[in-house]
Structure formats: structure tokens, C-alpha cells
């Protein structure tokens, strides 16, 4: 039967489209969609339940209620198909047409569409150049608008209220024309000549210089040109005909109680029809104007609430005071059409159950309950039963399954073999949250999960549930097996490290078996091979941890060598463990206590050296072995395992004495309360650390005599210590709370309580201590809940901005790249250069520092062997390709991306790197903190370091340094960005330090230094002013008690001058600026080198001068010191909020002020509360900026600054960095800042992922000069469009476009994407759709999201080939048929038009 119908069905070509075009629907188009006019507000007859004729559910308009049966029942059956019944007028056809046939309502008066009126910026308002308020007054019948002033002094589009209108009519009669309501607006829009208007705007643009005016004009210009180009007519923003949704999409369902459940839309439509009909009647009766006007206004309001309830005026509510859901509400938000039905659907063939551990499974297996499998694989079972002739029909097969016949279980066994299923655990934060396994049928009702897969799913067995999905088609099964099988996902896509790593019990077991124990049974025995060791161990002759000698196969570190037997000194456990090592892996990897890190390194090495298969087998074996020996170890935990250190009491007594001393000083008035607080906190946090250190020493080390009678130390076998040391569970910080002291606690406002909790959990807390600690515990729980939601939202925004970044080609051919060097924090190399460039492609060759030859050519993929060469070459910076500089237009190329982290080879075409990047950054989001850090105590003391002490031997290298030599012959730094690096003998950078202005260096550039040597010193508490030339000091504007204050130093008794702040000076001295000038022996001012400008040192408020007028000054002397306020420490935003701020490109509260041009600094006249800083460049350009007085400036009069240098401290704004220092610096800044946040939490993310997001944030450019293109100067455009246009212009020898990149936050960038479908499904649906339809946008369906929404394969992975094939076929067709036929296919699909030809806008 079905096949018959399918044959008759006309084949729908609507499926075959390549673009979607959205535009405004003209009244004629709306009528053409309609199957009839809805004239009555009635819905269905309450007795017969049949729809009323001409009503909202009318069968004549919308189609029959039952398949192939007219309403009155005259025609039934398929044979009458297509007949229109002459009694009831219903066409005999399928009832499903009631889901697609639309109706319409002819409105008695035009009505404005609220989206184009109220959605900001108001499109109608922009076109007419009126404010929204003015238009509303016209539309809602408060004012008249002058349409044609005629010969009167009235102006066009002037608004007149009732009285003014009457007055004008009395004065001028019918000379002028004024109207009100939507008719007036429609009339104006209809008679608008867009070409002339555009001409006018161009003329106005050339005439005006006002910024705001230009902005407004540009907006109007853009709107008008796009209206003109897209073929949308402005008057279509006013509705004459209202389309009616098909009735099955707004159903009316009778309930048992005789009441009806109805969609809100029906109520809204009824109001429109009622008011429309009433208005028609009033117009026929020629009712008084005021009544008609009121009715028209009510009709306008009814249509408004139907389209978007609540956007204007009161929200229309239903019977239960709940706002009615209008058409706009249907599509927006989480419950709207986009996010609820199009992007996420519920799927068939799925089930869910609790998970339990499956320690006997292999990595690619999962245990599936039989009952569940039976339900999931039903269709396959039916097929098997029928083909093997157990059953003749589907019905019979169904019966067999219901009766549980034995054949059914055989069938299940057969169909499940080699058929992978997919397991998913919510929340799916990254792609490893869904993996494929081969099912093993089990009894019971819980799914068994392999323990090693837990880390990827973030699953534990405390009641977690997982869902099972069955891939049905052959292709789906194939992809599940090759791409999603858990054994194919060993490495994490975020950082390329193994994610299949033993944890907890397994680690403990492996650690226990590889430890050494002195004096163990059988120590010193020798064995021929491992088998002999095994026999000896099983017979109880040797202990697991005994040190023995045994012959083992030996391989080189890199896996070469024959595996010759070598006598090795090791332990029994390690020898046994060596049995599971794959052939070719060196024994040295396990010849140590196997802590978690060591196990991870072993798996990583195995993967890199021997490949996937060996690694999977090794991981499984490690798991079985780990569980076995964890059981044998009998590790348990008891109160006696928590050893409280003996020294604790003594340490506490010492600290209490120190605190008493500080209290005493405070009481004597030597300390302020803030200083006291900081010092006390400092003491206690130090005490906590000391106790913890002593505790770990006592807990972790045991002294005993060995066989030779010597006293030796060995690690203890204390259970608690072993668990923490191996990395199985717990950390030093937690043990510290168990057996050390709990330490300092925070108050609810975040400040730290001065009295710490000195007890630990083993000793027990008293009531007060317990009460203090409750706050922290509760805050932790509240934080976690908030964090999850915030982290999820961040991931959603990231995915949305990067969803269409796909690898589309192999090589884009660019020669550009970014510079990468090691990451250094506080002098230590935190991330080595090798780690940062692993898996990248070189953009410039690497030159060997020792020989000067090319060590690695450009275009090399840096894998492990190449990294070894790189390290030998002794370079400390490398240029590599990056997605930031990739020249591919749509997507990125494989060479710029580099290695696919999850597979370990160059990335393949079709990989959705954007989504992977978003997931890698978003997934650890829940581990980040939510709160801002308060720096107190320990952190503060660390901040006041005043010297550089070297940790390694090497050669000192200075970079970015300006120095002068002082009278002692030492170098003094006079630059702010100076750095000191220590280079080792191989030419590698080992340490890097920033040197502040005024640091005194004890060494010269290139000098050899020894470990522990102090290279530079400075005073961390003051900021010096250093003389760069010599001369006699001469004071200007130094007036005691007016501009300066004299006091004597308490220690030395010398006179000290302090510059007074403006607020402390008398009014007469407000403009005086104290400065020190240097004079030569003739008494003339000394000028700075190469210029005529005298050297003046202006002194800011608070500066302290230790000189006298007329003192001799040498180069490098300190003229004055500016005290640093170290007490005022701001909180650093950390964790998630910081990451969100960076990705949203938010401007910091007090951004650093950067130099806009290169030149010389001078100070202009001060204004109230602000100082004026002027930079004069060499070519005569001048840049002025007003800076608040309280901002501390980094520069002095006469200093040279480079463009982009920091003038006043603060967090630099990313927009400034991009503008002044360029894209590379910006990328470096964002990557560095985000990595800092994640590194604090110990999360590793590859830089590439952050770069992908940055690339998306830089998608837009600002047009500076449009050249001979259709762009407008000052507008923002997509970079790819601009590049395309420039190619075209250059080919025609026309002027190209000049532009500069702009940075957009991720939310803004998602909404500004080329694809309106993707943007609408993200946020602000109404605004996006309104804008898109006015501009007549075309969605090319390039991204992933758009294709999911229209129900296609995504253009990534295996879907990329499908899309490229389609494109090629289409190009061929177009080539063969010419473009004549392609226009016929253009078919309007609602307002969303699916077009097959290239749009005119391309």
C-alpha cells in the first residue's frame, strides 16, 4: 500500500538545495501560499467535534481530518483521490496536508510588523529617519504624520497631534496631506525612492564631519543598499495579509473531561480575526472616526501579540495568568524550535542504565544487559528470525520475541557479534564522552564499563547512569568501529597525552609491586630469567619487594637493539611486571617505583614507539596486574596510619610567641592594624607549611639497619603515605589536614581569619574550630553548582564561535607563522620550547646555533625525532605555522594546524578542529575556580623580591636593555622591558628574569655566571628616578611648605624633601611643577643627546629627594625615589571568570595606557585631576592623552618610547594590543593569559586550541578605505569577503580595499557570523532573523550547525567528501546546462527561500 502511494507522490525537489535565502514576504507571496481565507474565529463544533467552515480549523481550506475522506463522508477510499467534494468543499487527500497547508487573513487595514518596528535598531525608524517613539505615535493613532506638505510651511514627515492637525486644516484646508496609522507609514514607504535617498546620503556623508551623524548615516546607507540589492520592498514591512499557520502545528485536543487543550496561537489568532471582522463591519457602517481608529489600534495590538507577545505594551495572558506563547516564542530560547527540535533530537534505539565496574573486560568491550540488548536489537533479530525461517512474518517474529523462545537468544548472540554500540555519559563535555564498544551480553540490569575508560567519561561507580545507542546502518557501524572505538581513543584531543591511564587501585597495586624494601626475604638472590623469579615468588622464597639480580632482555631507549639478555639489579615486582612489557620497550621505563606520572609516561612512550595495538594490550595488562597486586598488598587505612609529627607542639609554641610579639608591637603603636594582620597571617601560613613538611618527613621515611649493619633511610610502607605518593588518591594537602594542622580558614566575606585551626582531624576539632570550618565547606558546594552552569555556558559560546572551523585543504601555501619561545614564570622555565612546538610545522628553517647550518627545513612537521634535533641545535625561539596566519578562506589547512593530537600524525582533511578546540577549553572549565584570589600573607612576601639569584651555571644574556654606567662602574638599567636570560652550555635558555627600571647589574652581557650568584639588585619598595646624564642639580619650584615638605630621616638624620600632592598645596601653587634640572659647569642646562631639549626631571607627588640644591650628579645616580604603595593589593580575577573575560575581549576596569606612536615624552599643562602626556614623534606627529593623577606613570620627561609601550601600569586591553602591536602580540597575550589560569589548576591544553578561537575572534575587519568596491568606509565586514573582493579588484586593476583587523568577543562573533541560521540558533533569535530578512541574506550552509538544522550530513569528517562531491556535481551541471535551467529550480519555501543558483551578492 505504502509503496503504491509513494509511486503516486510527486517527487519533491525541495530537498535538493544548496543555499537558503531569507527575505520579506510580499502580500502576493503570502496569498500564493494560502489555500483560502480564514474568515471566522470559530475552531470546532463542540458537539460534533468537526471543524467549523471558514474557521481556524476549516477542512475546506486546510484539508481533510481523516486520510482520503471528505468531511461529510460522501467520498471515502483511495479511488476518489484528488476529488473536491461538492457538498462540503473538502479535497480528498492525506490528512498530513493539514501540517503544511497555510491559510490567510485579509486585514481590513495595514498593520506594521512588530519585528521591524521594535527589534532594535528599528528598521522602519532607520528608513524614515524617525525615532521609534515618533513612529509608535503614528502607528498607535496618537499623531498625524505629514505625507505631502504641498504649498504649506509644514515639513515632510512632521508629526502633528490632534489639535495641531485641526489648526492646520483650518489654516490651509486641503493644501496638505496628513494621515495616521500603519496606512500612513505604508504610503511613505511605498513612495520612497531608494536610489535618490542613497544619493542624498552620499552627499550628506561628504558634507559632514560629526562622528555620530556619520554613524547614523552609514547605518541608513547600509540598510537602503541592502534593500535595493536584495529586492525586498520597504512597504512589505507593513502587513496587508496575515498568514495563518497550518492547523496541525497549533493543535486543539479534546480532553477526557470535555474541556479542550489548545495551543496559545489559536487564542491569539481568534483575537486578530474578531477585531478584524469588527473593523470591517465598522468601516461598512461608516462609523465615527474615533471608533474606527480605536478598532484599528486594537487590531495592530492583536497582530503584535500574535507575532511577538510582550514586546510592546501589556503581555496578553491566558486564563491562568500565564503569558501566551506567540510565534516568536516558538522559535527562540532553549525550548524553542532551534535548540529543542532542530539541534537536539531524541533518538530511537537507545536505552540507559546504571553502570558498574567491569574489571575483566578488555578495553574495547562493555557489558550489556541481555534484556536491554534484546530491546535495542529488535529489528536485527526480526530479520535474522525471518531469513533463517524461524518465523514467516514480522508478526510471528514479534510473538517469538515476546515468548522468549530459545531461538531468540541465539539470534541475539548472532546479531550482536561484531556490532559496536555507543555509550554516552551526560554531561558530554568533549568528544570522548561518547565512545563505541563491542557489547558482551551479561545477566543483571546494569551496564558494565571498562575501568580505564572512566577518565574519558569522567565516570565513577557511585550510581552514575549511561546511555546506549545502536548505530544502525553499515556506514554508521563502520565509523563507530574505526573512529569511535575506545581502543582508538587513547590520547586526549586536548593535549595529546594518554587519557587511558590506570588510576586509583591500579596505581596503588603497580606502585606497591615496584617499590624496594630493604631486608626483604630473599634479598640478593640471583635468577636466570623471569620465569624462575615467578616460581620463587609463588613458592614464598622471595618477597615482592626484595632486591635481586635477574637476566632481562635489553633494548635501547628508542627501541632498537636485539633484546640481548643483560644481568640487571632490580626487585621481584619489577621483574614480574617486565613480563607484560611489549617487545622492544626498554626495561628502564618500569625500573622505578611506578607512580601515576611514570605509568602515564610508559603508556605514552609505548604509543609513540610501538603504535596503537601494543599500547591497548599493555594498558589492559597494567590494569589486570594493578588490581591483582592492590589486592595482595592489603593496603588499608586506620587512625594509627595518620602520624602526627612530634615537632608540632614545638613549632606551634614558637609561632605563638612570634604572634604575641607582634600583638605587643601593635599595642605599642609600632604597627598599623593592616600590617599586624598581614604579618600574623604570614606567620601562620609559614607554620602550617613547616608542620606539613615535618609530617611528610616522619610519615614517609623510616630508618633501619640493612644486612651490612649500616643505618639507612627508606620510604615507609605507611598506607596513607603510599596512596598519596603513588598518586592513587589524596594529596599532601589532604594528609596535612588529617595529620598536620588544618591551618587558616576564610570568613564568609573572603578575608582570612587570623587565628588558624591548629588541630587536625586525627586529634579532632573543638566546637569553635568546627564552626569556623563549616563556612568553607558550604561555600565549596555552592561554588561547584554555580561553576557547572557557568562552565557549560562558556563551552556553548566557544562551540558556537568555532563550529565552522574544519580542515578543508592540505596546505594553504602561506609563508607566515608565529614566533614561539619557552614560557618562563618567576625565572623558571614552566613550559619548555620543545613542549610548545611539538606537533607544529616550521614556517622558517631552524639554523643550528653551533654549526650555522640548516638543522630543520621550513615545512617540517616537528615530531619527537625532530624535537631531539631541535634541542641539539640550541635555539630558544622558533617560527612555526599557526591557524592565526593560515590563508585558507573557509576553514584552515592541515599544515597550519599541525598534528592531530588525538592520533599523533598530521591532521586529516575534514577534522572539525573548531569544535575540538572549544571542547578542549570548555571541558576542564568545571575544574577552574570561580572566585577572585585575595593575595595575602605568603603571596605578598614573595612579591617583594629585590634581586636576581641564579639557579644554574651558564652565560648571562641581556635583551631589550638600555643601561648607563654609574660611578662604581656598574650597569644601571634605564629601560622597563629589560630581560636577563641564563643560557646553558648547549645554548638553551634555562632561566629568564624581568629587570625593573633602576636595577643595578653586577655583571655584563655575555659574562659567565655560577649558581647562587646574585646578578642584579633593586629596591622593591620604591621606584627610582635615575640621572642619564651628569651635571649639577638645580631645583625648580621647590618651595618648602608649598610644593615640598622637609623632614629629617629617623635613622640617618639627613634632610629629606617630599613632594606634596596638589590637594595639599595652597591654591596659588596648583600650577607649580617641582623639577630637577642638570646644569653644566657654565650653568647652562644639559641637553639630551642629539637634541636641543634640556634634561628636566619632573617629580610626581610623593617623590622623596635626598639631594641638596647644587649637588654634583653622576650618570646613574638616583635623583629621587617614588615609594610604591605595596599595601594596596588588588584581587586578581582568576579561574573561569578570567577565561570568559579574555574570550569575550572585555576591556579591563583600569586598562594599561599604551603609547600610540613612537617618539619622545613630554608633559603638557595639567587639568583638574588629570595630567597631560604628550608624545612627539620624529616626523612631527603629536599625540596627547589625559591621564588621571592617581595613575602611576612609567615614563619621565624626555624619555623615548616605542609604539605600544606601556605608559601607565594596568592590565592591557586586548583591543589596544591588536591596534598597536599587531595580531601576533595579541595572540601571544591571550594564549599566555589563558594558559596561566589553566596551569594553576594543573590542566594541560595545547596552544593550538586557543589559537583557533582567537582566529575566530579576528574574523571581522574594519574598512578604512573602500577603494572601488561596494563596501562603505567605516563598516565592519567579514575578512574572507574583503579578501575575495580585493582579488576581484586587483584582477581588474582597480583600487583595493584598505582595512584593519578588529577583535570581537566570542558571543558577538557568533552573532556576527555569515550564517544567519547558525546565529539565530545561538542567541537573540528575533534580532538575527529580523536583520537577515531585511538584508535578504543567503546562508551558504558552510558550517556544521546550519547543516544539522536543515537535516544534512555535516561538512566535516566523512561528510566533507559528500559536500565536496555535491559542489563538484553542481558546478558540472551548471557548466553543462548553462545557468538558464538553474533559475527554474528556485522554489520558494516559506519566507525561507531555498535557491540553487549562486546569489547575486557573492
UniProtKB/Swiss-Prot annotation:
Residues 1373-1402 are annotated as: Disordered. It is an enzyme of class 2 (transferase). Keywords: DNA-directed RNA polymerase, Magnesium, Metal-binding, Nucleotidyltransferase, Transcription, Transferase, Zinc. Gene3D superfamilies: 1.10.132.30, 1.10.150.390, 1.10.1790.20, 1.10.40.90, 2.40.40.20, 2.40.50.100, RNA polymerase II, clamp domain (4.10.860.120), RNA polymerase Rpb1, domain 3 (1.10.274.100). GO terms for biological process: DNA-templated transcription. The keyword Acyltransferase does not apply. The RNAP catalytic core consists of 2 alpha, 1 beta, 1 beta' and 1 omega subunit. When a sigma factor is associated with the core the holoenzyme is formed, which can initiate transcription. It comes from Dichelobacter nodosus (strain VCS1703A). DNA-dependent RNA polymerase catalyzes the transcription of DNA into RNA using the four ribonucleoside triphosphates as substrates. Belongs to the RNA polymerase beta' chain family. Mg(2+) binds at residues 460, 462, 464. Pfam families: RNA_pol_Rpb1_1, RNA_pol_Rpb1_2, RNA_pol_Rpb1_3, RNA_pol_Rpb1_4, RNA_pol_Rpb1_5. GO terms for molecular function: DNA binding; DNA-directed RNA polymerase activity; magnesium ion binding; zinc ion binding. This is DNA-directed RNA polymerase subunit beta'. It catalyses: RNA(n) + a ribonucleoside 5'-triphosphate = RNA(n+1) + diphosphate. SMART domains: RPOLA_N (SM00663). Zn(2+) 2 binds at residues 812, 886, 893, 896. Binds 1 Mg(2+) ion per subunit. The lineage of its organism: Bacteria, Pseudomonadati, Pseudomonadota, Gammaproteobacteria, Cardiobacteriales. Its cofactor is Mg(2+); Zn(2+). Zn(2+) 1 binds at residues 70, 72, 85, 88.
Amino acid at each position: 500500500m505504502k509503496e503504491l502511494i509513494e509511486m503516486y507522490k510527486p517527487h519533491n525537489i525541495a530537498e535538493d538545495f544548496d543555499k537558503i535565502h531569507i527575505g520579506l514576504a510580499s502580500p502576493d507571496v503570502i496569498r500564493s501560499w494560502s489555500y483560502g481565507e480564514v474568515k471566522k474565529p470559530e475552531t470546532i463544533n463542540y458537539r460534533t467535534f468537526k471543524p467549523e467552515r471558514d474557521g481556524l480549523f476549516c477542512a475546506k481550506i486546510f484539508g481533510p481530518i481523516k486520510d482520503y475522506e471528505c468531511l461529510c463522508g460522501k467520498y471515502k477510499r483511495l479511488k476518489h483521490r484528488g476529488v473536491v467534494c461538492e457538498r462540503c468543499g473538502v479535497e480528498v487527500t492525506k490528512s498530513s496536508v493539514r501540517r503544511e497547508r497555510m491559510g490567510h487573513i485579509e486585514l481590513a487595514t495595514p498593520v506594521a510588523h512588530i519585528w521591524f518596528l521594535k527589534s532594535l535598531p528599528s528598521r522602519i525608524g532607520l528608513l524614515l529617519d524617525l525615532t521609534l517613539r515618533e513612529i509608535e505615535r503614528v502607528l498607535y493613532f496618537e499623531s498625524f504624520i505629514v505625507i505631502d506638505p504641498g504649498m504649506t510651511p509644514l515639513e515632510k514627515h512632521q508629526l502633528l497631534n490632534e489639535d495641531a492637525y485641526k489648526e492646520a486644516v483650518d489654516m490651509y484646508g486641503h493644501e496638505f496631506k496628513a494621515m495616521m496609522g500603519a496606512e500612513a507609514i505604508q504610503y511613505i514607504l511605498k513612495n520612497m525612492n531608494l536610489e535618490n535617498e542613497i544619493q542624498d546620503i552620499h552627499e550628506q556623508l561628504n558634507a559632514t564631519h560629526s562622528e555620530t551623524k556619520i554613524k547614523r548615516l552609514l547605518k541608513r546607507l547600509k540598510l537602503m543598499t541592502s534593500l535595493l540589492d536584495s529586492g525586498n520592498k520597504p512597504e512589505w514591512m507593513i502587513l496587508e495579509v496575515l498568514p495563518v499557520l497550518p492547523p496541525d502545528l497549533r493543535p486543539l485536543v479534546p480532553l477526557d473531561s470535555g474541556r479542550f487543550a489548545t495551543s496559545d496561537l489559536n487564542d491569539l489568532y481568534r483575537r486578530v480575526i474578531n477585531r478584524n471582522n469588527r473593523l470591517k463591519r465598522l468601516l461598512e457602517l461608516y462609523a465615527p472616526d474615533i471608533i474606527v481608529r480605536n478598532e484599528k489600534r486594537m487590531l495592530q495590538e492583536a497582530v503584535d501579540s500574535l507575532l511577538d507577545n510582550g514586546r510592546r505594551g501589556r503581555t496578553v495572558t491566558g486564563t491562568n495568568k500565564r503569558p501566551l506563547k506567540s510565534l516568536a516564542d516558538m522559535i527562540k530560547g532553549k525550548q524553542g524550535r532551534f535548540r529543542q527540535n532542530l539541534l537536539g533530537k531524541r533518538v530511537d534505539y537507545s536505552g540507559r542504565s546504571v553502570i558498574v565496574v567491569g574489571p575483566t573486560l578488555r578495553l574495547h568491550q562493555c557489558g550489556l544487559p541481555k534484556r536491554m540488548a534484546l530491546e535495542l536489537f529488535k529489528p536485527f533479530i526480526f530479520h535474522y528470525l525471518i531469513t533463517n525461517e524461524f518465523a514467516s512474518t514480522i508478526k510471528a517474529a514479534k510473538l517469538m520475541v515476546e515468548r522468549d523462545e530459545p531461538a531468540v537468544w541465539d539470534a541475539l548472540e548472532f546479531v550482536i557479534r561484531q556490532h559496536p554500540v555507543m555509550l554516552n555519559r551526560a554531561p558530554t563535555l568533549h568528544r570522548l564522552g561518547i565512545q563505541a564498544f563491542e557489547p558482551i551480553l551479561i545477566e543483571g540490569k546494569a551496564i558494565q564499563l571498562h575501568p580505564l575508560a572512566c577518565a574519558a567519561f569522567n565516570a565513577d561507580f557511585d550510581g552514575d547512569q549511561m546511555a546506549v545507542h545502536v548505530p544502525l546502518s553499515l556506514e554508521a557501524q563502520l565509523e563507530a568501529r574505526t573512529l569511535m572505538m575506545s581502543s582508538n581513543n587513547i590520547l586526549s584531543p586536548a593535549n595529546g597525552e594518554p587519557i587511558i591511564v590506570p588510576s586509583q587501585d591500579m596505581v596503588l597495586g603497580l606502585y606497591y609491586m615496584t617499590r624496594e624494601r630493604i631486608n626483604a626475604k630473599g634479598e640478593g638472590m640471583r635468577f636466570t630469567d623471569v620465569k624462575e623469579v615467578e616460581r620463587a615468588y609463588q613458592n614464598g622464597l622471595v618477597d615482592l619487594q626484595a632486591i635481586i639480580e635477574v637476566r632481562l632482555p635489553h633494548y635501547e631507549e628508542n627501541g632498537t637493539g636485539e633484546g640481548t639478555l643483560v644481568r640487571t639489579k632490580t626487585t621481584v615486582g619489577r621483574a614480574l611486571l617486565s613480563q607484560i612489557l611489549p617487545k622492544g620497550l626498554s626495561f628502564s621505563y618500569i625500573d622505578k617505583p611506578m607512580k601515576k606520572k611514570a605509568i602515564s609516561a610508559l603508556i605514552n612512550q609505548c604509543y609513540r614507539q610501538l603504535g596503537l595495538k601494543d599500547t591497548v594490550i599493555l594498558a589492559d595488562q597494567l590494569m589486570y596486574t594493578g588490581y591483582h597486586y592492590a589486592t595482595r598488598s592489603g593496603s588499608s587505612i586506620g587512625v594509627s596510619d595518620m602520624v602526627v609529627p612530634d615537632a608540632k607542639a614545638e613549632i606551634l609554641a614558637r609561632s605563638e610567641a612570634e604572634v604575641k610579639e607582634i600583638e605587643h608591637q601593635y599595642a605599642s603603636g609600632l604597627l598599623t592594624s593592616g600590617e599586624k594582620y598581614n604579618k600574623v597571617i604570614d606567620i601562620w601560613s609559614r607554620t602550617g607549611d613547616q608542620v606539613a613538611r615535618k609530617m611528610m618527613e616522619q610519615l614517609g621515611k623510616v630508618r633501619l639497619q640493612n644486612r651490612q649493619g649500616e643505618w639507612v633511610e627508606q620510604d615507609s610502607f605507611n598506607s596513607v603515605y603510599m596512596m598519596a605518593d603513588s598518586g592513587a588518591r589524596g594529596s599532601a594537602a589532604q594528609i596535612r589536614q588529617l595529620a598536620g594542622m588544618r591551618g587558616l580558614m576564610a570568613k564568609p566575606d573572603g578575608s582570612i581569619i587570623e587565628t588558624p585551626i591548629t588541630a587536625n582531624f586525627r586529634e579532632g576539632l573543638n566546637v569553635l574550630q568546627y564552626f569556623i570550618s563549616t563556612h568553607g565547606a558550604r561555600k565549596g558546594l555552592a561554588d561547584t553548582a554555580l561553576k557547572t552552569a557557568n562552565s557549560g555556558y562558556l563551552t556553548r559560546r566557544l562551540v558556537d564561535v568555532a563550529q565552522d572551523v574544519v580542515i578543508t585543504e592540505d596546505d594553504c601555501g602561506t609563508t607566515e607563522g608565529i614566533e614561539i619561545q619557552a614560557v618562563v614564570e618567576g625565572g623558571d622555565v614552566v613550559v619548555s620550547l620543545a613542549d610548545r612546538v611539538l606537533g607544529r610545522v616550521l614556517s622558517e628553517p631552524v639554523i643550528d646555533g653551533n654549526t650555522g647550518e640548516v638543522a630543520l627545513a621550513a615545512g617540517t612537521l616537528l615530531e619527537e625525532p625532530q624535537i631531539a634535533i631541535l634541542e641539539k641545535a640550541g635555539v630558544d625561539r622558533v617560527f612555526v605555522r599557526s591557524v592565526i596566519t593560515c590563508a585558507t578562506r573557509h576553514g584552515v589547512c592541515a599544515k597550519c594546524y599541525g598534528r592531530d593530537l588525538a592520533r599523533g600524525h598530521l591532521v586529516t582533511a575534514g577534522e572539525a578542529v573548531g569544535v575540538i578546540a572549544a571542547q578542549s577549553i570548555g571541558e576542564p572549565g568545571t575544574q577552574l575556580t570561580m572566585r577572585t584570589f585575595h593575595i595575602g600573607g605568603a603571596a605578598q612576601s614573595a612579591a617583594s623580591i629585590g634581586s636576581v639569584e641564579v639557579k644554574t651555571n651558564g652565560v648571562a644574556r641581556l635583551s631589550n636593555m638600555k643601561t648607563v654606567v654609574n660611578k662604581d662602574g656598574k650597569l644601571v638599567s634605564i629601560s622597563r622591558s629589560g630581560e636577563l636570560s641564563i643560557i646553558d652550555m648547549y645554548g638553551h635558555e634555562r632561566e629568564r628574569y624581568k629587570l625593573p627600571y633602576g636595577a643595578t647589574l653586577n655583571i655584563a652581557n655575555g659574562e659567565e655566571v655560577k649558581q647562587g650568584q646574585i646578578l642584579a639588585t633593586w629596591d622593591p619598595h620604591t621606584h627610582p628616578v635615575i640621572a642619564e646624564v651628569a651635571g649639577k642639580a638645580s631645583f625648580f619650584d621647590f618651595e618648602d611648605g608649598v610644593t615640598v615638605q622637609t623632614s629629617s630621616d629617623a635613622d640617618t638624620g639627613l634632610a629629606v624633601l617630599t613632594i606634596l600632592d596638589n590637594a595639599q598645596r595652597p591654591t596659588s601653587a596648583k600650577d607649580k611643577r617641582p623639577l630637577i634640572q642638570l646644569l653644566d659647569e657654565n650653568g647652562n642646562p644639559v641637553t639630551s643627546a642629539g637634541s636641543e631639549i634640556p634634561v628636566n626631571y619632573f617629580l610626581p607627588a610623593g617623590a622623596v629627594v635626598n639631594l641638596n640644591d647644587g649637588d654634583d650628579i653622576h650618570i646613574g645616580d638616583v635623583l629621587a625615589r617614588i615609594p610604591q604603595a605595596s599595601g594596596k593589593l588588588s584581587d586578581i580575577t582568576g579561574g573561569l571568570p578570567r577565561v570568559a573575560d579574555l574570550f569575550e575581549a572585555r576591556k579591563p576596569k583600569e586598562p594599561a595606557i599604551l603609547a600610540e606612536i613612537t617618539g619622545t615624552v613630554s608633559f603638557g599643562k595639567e587639568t583638574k585631576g588629570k595630567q597631560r602626556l604628550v608624545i612627539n614623534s620624529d616626523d612631527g606627529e603629536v599625540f596627547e592623552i589625559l591621564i588621571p593623577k592617581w595613575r602611576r606613570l612609567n615614563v619621565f620627561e624626555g624619555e623615548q618610547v616605542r609604539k605600544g609601550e606601556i605608559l601607565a601600569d594596568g592590565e592591557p586591553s586586548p583591543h589596544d594590543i591588536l591596534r598597536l602591536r599587531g595580531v601576533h602580540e595579541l595572540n601571544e597575550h591571550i594564549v599566555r593569559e589563558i594558559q596561566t589560569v589553566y596551569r594553576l589548576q594543573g590542566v594541560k591544553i595545547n596552544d593550538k586550541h586557543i589559537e583557533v578561537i582567537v582566529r575566530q575572534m579576528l574574523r571581522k575587519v574594519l574598512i578604512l578605505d573602500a577603494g572601488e568596491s561596494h563596501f562603505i568606509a567605516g563598516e565592519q565586514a567579514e575578512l574572507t569577503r574583503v579578501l575575495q573582493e580585493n582579488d576581484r579588484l586587483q584582477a581588474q586593476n582597480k583600487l583595493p580595499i584598505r582595512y584593519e583587523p578588529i577583535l570581537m568577543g566570542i558571543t558577538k562573533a557568533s552573532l556576527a557570523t555569515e550564517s544567519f541560521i547558525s546565529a539565530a540558533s545561538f542567541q537573540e533569535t528575533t534580532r538575527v532573523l529580523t536583520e537577515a530578512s531585511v538584508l535578504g541574506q543567503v546562508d551558504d550552509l558552510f558550517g556544521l550547525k546550519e547543516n544539522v538544522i536543515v537535516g544534512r550530513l555535516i561538512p566535516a569528517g566523512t561528510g566533507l567528501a559528500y559536500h565536496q562531491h555535491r559542489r563538484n556535481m553542481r558546478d558540472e551541471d551548471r557548466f553543462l546546462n548553462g545557468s538558464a535551467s538553474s533559475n527554474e529550480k528556485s522554489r520558494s519555501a516559506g519566507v525561507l527561500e531555498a535557491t540553487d543558483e549562486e546569489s547575486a551578492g557573492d
